[in-house]
């Protein structure tokens, strides 16, 4: 039995198995939407859960405006990642073709404007997109020099889906989020 268990573990290390963060079914996290209005911006966010053809998903839309030093809308969830054997995040998404972002905050991103981010582009069709942790870059700006260039996967405390950085109408759906 020990030999068999060893072979199973050896042939299927944890890094090859996905871990669901949110599937809108039996695994859920609490998403909180907000915009740059928390810092004086004028971007507007609408966020709600929808269902279409039997598939439940989160929907975020709104006008992103860079006026008043703004430029983002997002929905973010507190998470606790305790296993560093994963290579990245996988998101089931569709949208209006704009470039969107995943922002990760860690134990070291103590100031609200610090994060590690990576972009992805949507289409109008559902797709799973893999975003490797190696593609996440630390944010620039005030006090970002105190952040390590790479983040500690075990230190992840929140994940945000973000429309950011330019004037545009954001429209994105998310039906799943996993570690891979």
Label the model's feature ranges.
Residues 1-6:
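Sec-dependent signal peptide recognition
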Residues 7-15:
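Hydrophobic h-region of N-terminal signal peptides that target proteins for export
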